[in-house]
Swiss-Prot record:
Catalytic activity: 2 a quinone + NADH + H(+) = 2 a 1,4-benzosemiquinone + NAD(+); N,N-dimethyl-1,4-phenylenediamine + anthranilate + 2 NAD(+) = 2-(4-dimethylaminophenyl)diazenylbenzoate + 2 NADH + 2 H(+)
Catalytic class of the enzyme: oxidoreductase
Protein known as: FMN-dependent NADH:quinone oxidoreductase 1
Organism: Cupriavidus pinatubonensis (strain JMP 134 / LMG 1197) (Cupriavidus necator (strain JMP 134))
Taxonomic placement: Bacteria, Pseudomonadati, Pseudomonadota, Betaproteobacteria, Burkholderiales
InterPro entries linked to this entry: Flavodoxin_fold, Flavoprotein-like_sf, FMN-dep_NADH:Q_OxRdtase_AzoR1, NADH:quinone_OxRdtase_FMN_depd
One Pfam match: Flavodoxin_2
Keywords: Flavoprotein, FMN, NAD, Oxidoreductase
């Protein structure tokens, strides 16, 4: 089993999502001895945001790239290879101003490539990255207005992964983290319970 852990929080060791992604991955490894883990820290190694300078890197002929673009091409190919090789992705997705961290969006811009992870057909786009499992660790200071609906940052990653052909998506939520000590502990406790349920149900085993 190849496990890709994606961390995008800017809070380092104080990050709830980072601590929880590490916990999920530890349980995955315990349930799947010999699993290979790749950790991609999008804060410490942040992808550059999409720009005109990057367009030649992400599509079209690769001849004529300058040195900076060649370096970005190699980084992009590394991230794309990690994504394609992963059987399970554990993705830390904190909510920043109603959306996902910009560095996570930049990573998505690198791996969502026509002809590589999806394709266009006469009947619409088709994902090419199916067969993977995604565990999204969702964290936020507040709480969802509707417990039956995905939150805004969750909807973003859900749409992206489904567009790429991935339908096995599970959410671990630590919400209410900025609403006082009791709400914070309740959010953390809920997330721990959800992680334990993944393990109890045998969902962490290959």
């Amino acid at each position: 089993m190849n496990i890709l852990q994606i961390d995008s929080s800017v809070l380092g060791g104080h990050s709830v999502s980072r601590n929880l992604t590490a916990s999920v991955v530890a349980d995955l490894v315990a349930a799947n001895p010999g699993a290979k883990v790749t950790v991609r820290d999008l804060d410490q190694d942040a992808p550059a945001h999409l720009s005109g300078h990057l367009l030649p890197v992400l599509g079209g002929p690769k001849d004529g790239l300058n040195a900076a673009q060649e370096a970005e091409l190699q980084r992009t190919e590394t991230w794309l290879a990690e994504f394609l090789a992963a059987d399970v992705l554990v993705v830390g997705v904190p909510q920043y101003n109603f959306s996902i961290p910009s560095q996570l969006k930049s990573w998505i811009d690198r791996i969502a490539q026509a002809g590589r992870t999806f394709k266009y057909t006469e009947n619409g786009p088709v994902g090419l990255a199916g067969g993977k499992r995604v565990i999204v660790v969702s964290s936020r200071g507040g709480v969802r207005q509707d417990a039956n609906e995905l939150d805004l940052h969750e909807k973003t990653v859900d749409v992206v992964f489904r567009f790429l052909g991935i339908t096995d998506i599970t959410y671990v939520r630590a919400h209410g983290l900025a609403m006082g000590p009791d709400a914070r502990e309740a959010g953390l406790s809920s997330a721990r319970t959800e992680i334990a349920a993944l393990n109890d149900g045998g969902r962490l085993a290959a």
